[in-house]
Amino acid sequence: METNNHFFYVVKCKDNSWYAGYTNDLHKRVKTHNDGKGAKYTKVRRPVELIFAESFSTKREAMQAEYYFKKLTRKKKELYIEEKRNSKEAVYVKAPNEL
């Protein structure tokens, strides 16, 4: 991944809950979560699996997407991901039956 990109991402935890965050390096961030060095929330819910990532040109835009997403209900989060599936910003989306 290019280091000048900014990503809003969602990982699925072992207990099927979701964690949303911001990063400028997707691979490294998911690895950090799985190494138990990421967020406290994911530390006790490992392993995590990337289910969605969206690219933005600025950190601010990516963090705004994260903030918006975190306010949604689970059902609306699923709809958000499905609606973004074919957008040019979506860089990774799991199949609907795998969410």
Swiss-Prot record:
SMART domains: GIYc (SM00465). Disulfide bonds: none annotated. Residues 4-79 form the GIY-YIG domain. SUPFAM superfamilies: GIY-YIG endonuclease (SSF82771). InterPro entries: GIY-YIG_endonuc (IPR000305), GIY-YIG_endonuc_sf (IPR035901), UPF0213_domain (IPR050190). CDD domains: GIY-YIG_UPF0213. It holds the Pfam family GIY-YIG. Belongs to the UPF0213 family. This is UPF0213 protein YazA. The gene is yazA.
